[in-house]
Amino acid sequence: MGKTPAQKKRNQYLASVRARGASGHNLWFVRPPQDTQALPLTLSSDIELEAFFYLEGSPDVASVDYSPLRHGQARSQPGRRHFAIVTTLEGTELDVELAPEADKASVAGRRLISLSVLNAAKVRVQSWRAIVPTINRCRSHSLDPLIICCRRLLEEHGQLAVRDMCQQLASESTALVTGAVATLLRSREIESDVD
């Protein structure tokens, strides 16, 4: 009996994950908020998923390039794996390596993400576990007018809770207002206490 198209597709994903040296038993398909790729990013462990949310929520990171994972170019060393390339708000480009047992947070030109780093950032990881899907749900909508309204409200009132912004913009969809706020957070135009 032949395989169904869905089984063939799943086997392709598993083969690509195994080709980069990871286990195919725990797959996560995520869509980075700033990503324009048609296909989602495939992560193969809970640690990779947490590292993804950690990077997306890092307040000093302007953008994240996951091409090392996407194109199977993730260099590996014992105990380390190239995970992404980040550009900081200052414009510095850093290689990010997943190193679960590392005892340092970074070395020259590299940022290491270890279990201790992820454990110390549990609130950030949990917060961005909700923020990223909020952004992605609004991808098909034009948020620009709402983003402008949110900026105006913040300029007028200073700090506002998301709930207060939704009340101020009661004529708009709450989902779209929260999507606009989440987009502003990810673009680092505003700061929040989600860490």
Show the residue positions of the predicted features.
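Electrostatic, structured charged patches in enzyme active sites and in nucleic-acid/phosphate-binding
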Residues: 1-195
